[in-house]
């Protein structure tokens, strides 16, 4: 009798082990798939998020105090193979725009203040050669635009 109870107990334990193994495997696949889906969904959203209009970039600067992720500096672009005279930014850095470099304000057309620095970013760039639209933002978050390549400036924030 004890021998039969031992065999029955072994069968139950084996069955429970198999059920646990199946359950753990299913849970692992479920969480793995969910994580991959969330990661790829976030990646696609981030890659698709190109902000390059005057209002879009100005709003982003005011909110986050940095340029959107689709901006790279001239040196970062050059490291990827960008040559300004070739107009090849879209080829070497798809979806990216030039921005974040220092603007010297040599002519003094933008408001000056001790310790204030200005940076610039391309606006409305899609491909080919860069256009004349730029946004200028200061270290104390003044924001100006130019549509005539630094000839005139308009405060937008």
UniProtKB/Swiss-Prot annotation:
Cellular compartments per GO CC: extracellular region
Name of one Pfam family that matches: Ribonuclease
Key words of the record: Endonuclease, Genetically modified food, Hydrolase, Nuclease, Secreted, Signal
Function: Hydrolyzes phosphodiester bonds in RNA, poly- and oligoribonucleotides resulting in 3'-nucleoside monophosphates via 2',3'-cyclophosphate intermediates.
MF terms (GO), sorted A to Z: RNA binding; RNA endonuclease activity
Primary subcellular site in the record, as a coarse category: secreted
InterPro entries recorded: Barnase, N1-like, Ribonuclease/ribotoxin, RNase_N1/T1-like_sf
Protein name: Ribonuclease
Subcellular location per the Swiss-Prot or TrEMBL entry: Secreted
Enzymatic class: hydrolase
Active site: residue positions: 120 (proton acceptor), 149 (proton donor)
Use in biotech settings: Introduced by genetic manipulation and expressed in male sterile maize and rape by Plant Genetic Systems and in radicchio rosso by Bejo Zaden. Barnase expressed in transgenic plants will specifically destroy the tissue(s) where it is expressed. After cell transformation, protein expression and plant regeneration, the active nuclease destroys the pollen producing organs thus rendering the plant sterile.
Family: Belongs to the ribonuclease N1/T1 family.
């Amino acid at each position: 009798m004890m021998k039969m109870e031992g065999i029955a107990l072994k069968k139950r334990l084996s069955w429970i082990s198999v059920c646990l193994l199946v359950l753990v495997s299913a849970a692992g696949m479920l969480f793995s798939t969910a994580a991959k889906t969330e990661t790829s969904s976030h990646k696609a959203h981030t890659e698709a998020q190109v902000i390059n209009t005057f209002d879009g970039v100005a709003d982003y600067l005011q909110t986050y105090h940095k340029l959107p992720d689709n901006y790279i500096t001239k040196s970062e672009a050059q490291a990827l193979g960008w040559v300004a005279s070739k107009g090849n930014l879209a080829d070497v850095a798809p979806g990216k725009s030039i921005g974040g470099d220092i603007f010297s304000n040599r002519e003094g057309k933008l408001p000056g203040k001790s310790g204030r620095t200005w940076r610039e970013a391309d606006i409305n760039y899609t491909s080919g050669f860069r256009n004349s639209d730029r946004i200028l933002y200061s270290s104390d978050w003044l924001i100006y635009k130019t549509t005539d390549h630094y000839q005139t400036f308009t405060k937008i924030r």
